[in-house]
Amino acid sequence: MKLLLLFLYFGVLIGIGLYCRKHATDVNGFVLGGRSVGPWLTAFAYGTSYFSAVVFVGYAGQFGWKYGLAATWAGIGNAIIGSLLAWVVLGRRMRIMTQHLDSATMPQFFGERFGSRPLKVGASVIIFVFLIPYTASLYNGLSRLFGMAFHIDYSVCIVLMAVLTAIYVIAGGYMATAINDFIQGIIMLLGISTIIVAVLKSKGGFMAALDGLARVTDESVASTPGIFASFFGPDPLNLLFVVILTSLGTWGLPQMVQKFYAIKNEESIKKGTIISTLFALVVAGGSYFLGGFGRLYSDRIDVNANGFDSIIPTMLSDLSPILISLVVILVLSASMSTLSSLVIASSSTLTIDFLKELFFPKMEEKKQVLSIRLLVVVFIAISSVLALIQYKSSVTFIAQLMGVSWGALAGSFLAPFMYALYSKRVTKASCWACFLFGSTLMVANIFFRPYFPEVMQSPINCGAIAMLAGLVMVPIVSVFTPKPNQKLVEDAFACYEKKTEVSRKTSLGK
C-alpha cells in the first residue's frame, strides 16, 4: 500500500511535467510561466518552496527541542513576516518593475536597475555558490524518513528524488513546477494537520501532552520548572534570531522572489497574499508546534549520538503504516518543490546572467532554453553528490546548512533588492558592499567560527545579523558614494507612473 501511494504520486508529477511542455518553449515560458500564473498556483509555489525537509525535519526538531512550544513563534513569524509582509511590501512593486526592466532573474534585475554588468555577474556567482548547501540539506532530511518507512538505502533516495525532479522540471519548466507545487501543497496541508492530531492523540491529547511537557526539566538548559511549555522558552534571544533568519530571509532569496515575477495580475497578488499567509501558518506553525513536543520522547532520542535531525523521525516512528506513508509523501513533496525552485533559479541565472552575458552574447532563445535544461541536470547532479559527501562528513545538522545558505544569500541581496524597488538613491557601491559583506561573513563563519563572538558562532544567528546589517549598510553607503545615473533611475521608476485602464469591478473610478 505504501509503495502504491508513492508510485501513484510519482506518476502524477511526471504526467504534469509532460503536459506542461507547451509552456516551456522560450525563456519567459520556461523560467516564469509566461508571467501568467494565477493566485493559487503562485501562493502554493511560494509556500512549498519556502518549507521543505529543512523545516519539517531540521528546524522543527532542533528548535522544538531547544525552545519547546515557544518554537511555534518561528512559524508565526514565517506567516506574518515571511509571507504576509513579503507579499505586501515586495509583491506588487517587484512584478511591475521586473516586467518593465524585462528581467527574469534577480541578477538580471540588478544589472538592468543599476546599469551594471559586473553587478549582474557578481550576483549570479553568489547565487550559484550558496544555493548548493541548501539543496544538499534537502536530500538529507528526506533520507531519514524514507529509511524509516521503506528501509531504502540513502543513495537510492537521493537518486530517486533527483531523477523525478529533473524529469518534470526539464519537461515543463516553471509551469509544471507551479502545478506540482499546488498538488504538493495540498498534501503538505493535509499531512501536517493529520500528523499533529495523531502525535498528540498518542500522548493522551493536547492537555495531557502539554502537562507532560511542563514537567520536563533539563538543568543544562534552564532550572526553571515548565520552561519548555512557557511562552518564550528558555532562550528568547536566540529564538528571535531564528525568527529573523527564517522569516525575513525569504525577502532576499532568489528562488522565493522569483515567484512574484510570474504572477498574473493585481487581483492575483491580493488573493495570493491571503492564501500564502494561511498556508505558512498551517505548515510552518504546525511543524514548529509539533517539534515543540519533541522532549516528550527524550527517553528514545540521543541527540548527542544521532543529531537533532533524528527527533521528528523518532516522534513519528510509532504511527500506522498509512500515516508514515503520508509523512514520507509530505516531506518528499516539500523537498521536491523546493529543489525544483532552486534548480530553476540557479540554471536560469547561470544561463542568462553568466554564460550569455560573458561568453555567448548572441545566444538564441532556443539555445538559452536548452542551456537552462542542461544546467538543471548539472545542478541536481552536483547537489546530489554533495548530499552524499555531507552525509558522511562531520556536518550533520540540516539547520546549519540552511543557515549558511540563507544567511549568505539574504545577507547579500535582501537590502539592495528591497531598497532598489522603493528608493532612487541606492547606489551600485552600496549593492557591492552588501554583496561582499553578506557572502564574506558567512564564509568566514564556516572556516573561522571559534573566533567569532559567542552570539555569532551559530550560522543561524550570523545569517540573521548579516541581513539586519545590510538594511543599515545600504542607506549609509549610498549617502557617501557617487549618485546613480539619474536617467537610468528615472527610467526604472517610470513604470510606477504608467496609466492602466481597469474595469469598474476593480476600481470605482471618479
List where the protein language model places each region.
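Membrane-embedded helix-loop-helix hairpins and adjacent transmembrane boundary segments
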Residues: 1-510
